[in-house]
């Protein structure tokens, strides 16, 4: 029973190959291009030829590539950029580790944790501090 079922499955799987193959050709010899197939009735369902681009589309694509190249060159060229003015303070919740500038908020202080490995500007609220959160 099992052998009959296995033989039937093998025949069903091999049937399309036997019916569609051309006599005297190996399976890959009949395919000259990607849009050709061994099965002539299925040739119309294959890959469509690529669409031809108009000159306007080509010009637009060239302009986009030039604009991208120019933008990339501006980003990567540090000499072409303006020099940034040094920041005079560190904002709240930003890292103040290694900075010699104070926090922007006068009520904030540079708060360090984990053996001074993680420091950031934070408002510390205490009862004696006039800037405490209430």
From Swiss-Prot:
Residues 89-131 form the Agouti domain. InterPro entries: Agouti (IPR007733), Agouti_dom (IPR027300), Agouti_dom_sf (IPR036836). Residues 1-20 form the signal peptide. The record marks 84-85 as: Cleavage. Its main location: secreted. One of its GO terms (cellular component) is Golgi lumen. GO terms for biological process: adult feeding behavior; hormone-mediated signaling pathway; neuropeptide signaling pathway; positive regulation of feeding behavior; regulation of feeding behavior. It comes from the Eukaryota. PROSITE patterns: AGOUTI_1 (PS60024), AGOUTI_2 (PS51150). It is found in: Secreted; Golgi apparatus lumen. The keyword Disulfide bond applies. Coiled coil: none annotated. Residues 113-115 are annotated as: Interaction with melanocortin receptors. Interacts with melanocortin receptors MC3R, MC4R and MC5R. Plays a role in weight homeostasis. Involved in the control of feeding behavior through the central melanocortin system. Acts as alpha melanocyte-stimulating hormone antagonist by inhibiting cAMP production mediated by stimulation of melanocortin receptors within the hypothalamus and adrenal gland. Has very low activity with MC5R. Is an inverse agonist for MC3R and MC4R being able to suppress their constitutive activity. It promotes MC3R and MC4R endocytosis in an arrestin-dependent manner. The presence of a 'disulfide through disulfide knot' structurally defines this protein as a knottin. This is Agouti-related protein.
């Amino acid at each position: 029973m099992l052998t009959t079922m296995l033989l039937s499955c093998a025949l069903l799987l091999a049937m399309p190959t036997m019916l569609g193959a051309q006599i005297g050709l190996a399976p890959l010899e009949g395919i000259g291009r990607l849009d050709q197939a061994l099965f002539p009735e299925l040739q119309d369902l294959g890959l469509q030829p690529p669409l031809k681009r108009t000159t306007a589309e080509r010009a637009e694509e060239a302009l986009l590539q030039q604009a991208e190249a120019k933008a990339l060159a501006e980003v990567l060229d540090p000499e072409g950029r303006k020099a940034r003015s040094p920041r005079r303070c560190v904002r709240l919740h930003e890292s103040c580790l290694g900075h010699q500038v104070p926090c922007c908020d006068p009520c904030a202080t540079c708060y360090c944790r984990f053996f001074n490995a993680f420091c950031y500007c934070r408002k510390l609220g205490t009862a004696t501090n006039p800037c405490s959160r209430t």
